[in-house]
């Protein structure tokens, strides 16, 4: 941000240009920080999900089918990432004090939060897989595995919503267009378990009884 601001000030000595450059840099940092935190939380949850399922021999270690993981990662999560990109700048970003030099996204406390959040998601999915309705299968669609997949996918979207603002509630105005992409993530998860095409592709079953 300092280098960018320096280049701008050489050609434009208006103080407002410098302020705008700092504002832009802080907003870019916020988006990158939210993206990194979301991805590492999801990675933590998936790794713990697979590891615990293998250790406890839940459904022979098959917590989710590969296509379910790929759909959650490359379709559902992408909607949240796009939401980060198109979200309006944080209106209060210039009211906060500057970050300390050398501050990092991946601090020790933040790593602990990623692990705990991932464990909660993984534990919820595994509980449904182990004790949910119907016996899970390593080859065929089942209600319990579909519920586990739904927990993972919805948790990814909801975590993205929570991580939208660093020091503000996630529903702080203006909500759109960010909320529109979050809603698309919810809709894709619903479609994955309720439309026949995606049911066949992802080996899911309807959770509404339809």
Locate each region found by the language model:
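Membrane-interface helix termini and inter-helical loops of multi-pass transporters
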Residues: 133-139, 197-207
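Alpha-helical transmembrane segments of multi-pass membrane proteins
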Residues: 181-185
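Cytoplasmic-side transmembrane-helix entry/capping segments in multi-pass membrane proteins
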Residues: 171-180
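Membrane-embedded transport module
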Residues: 3-168, 192
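Structural signal for alpha-helical transmembrane segments and their membrane-water exit/capping regions
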Residues: 188-195
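Generic alpha-helical secondary structure signal
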Residues: 16, 109, 177, 196-199
